[in-house]
A protein has these predicted regions:
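C-terminal regulatory/interaction module of P-loop NTP-utilizing enzymes
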Residues: 1-148
């Protein structure tokens, strides 16, 4: 199902580089699932950030009449620990998921209606998570605003 997939957006082009030859590895689904479970145990999303996500959900409902839904929060709790295990940090994982799973839904709204609310959401994200901590969300919202 498309809304459960995690699309990879390639917005920039990096410089050409030579990738070293590496040995292939085989892994079973069971092993991979075990790694995901281990990530969830070792790097759960903090209660502080879960509360911030709940506050953001209320903000988006109040200003855009759009709710995250329990499935998105469940995905966030599974995705962010794996993101951390791959070398990212918690807020960066939250930023990525919000930008690609939640804000993408804004395209279905009446863009003229939400135009005046976008700057407020950018400011709210900065207040909630810290200045410069949600660059993916900010970039997406500013791109969306340009299309209006």
């Amino acid at each position: 199902v498309y809304d459960r997939a995690m699309p990879i957006a390639i917005d920039d082009k990096c410089e050409v580089f030579e990738a070293p030859d590496t040995d292939k590895i085989k892994t079973s689904y069971k092993h991979l699932e075990g790694l995901f479970e281990k990530s969830s145990e070792e790097h759960p999303v903090s209660e502080e950030n879960l509360e911030k996500i709940a506050q953001l959900d209320r903000y988006v409902i109040d200003h855009f009449r759009l709710a995250f839904g329990n499935r998105i929060v469940k995905q966030l709790k599974e995705f962010v620990p794996a993101f951390i295990d791959c070398g990212g940090d918690e807020v960066a994982g939250i930023d990525y998921l919000i930008a690609h799973k939640i804000l993408r839904k804004f395209e279905q709204l009446n863009l003229a209606y939400i135009k005046d609310e976008i700057d407020g959401l950018v400011n709210y994200l900065e207040k909630l998570f810290g200045t410069g901590k949600t660059p993916e969300c900010k970039a997406y919202l500013l791109r969306l605003k340009k299309t209006i």
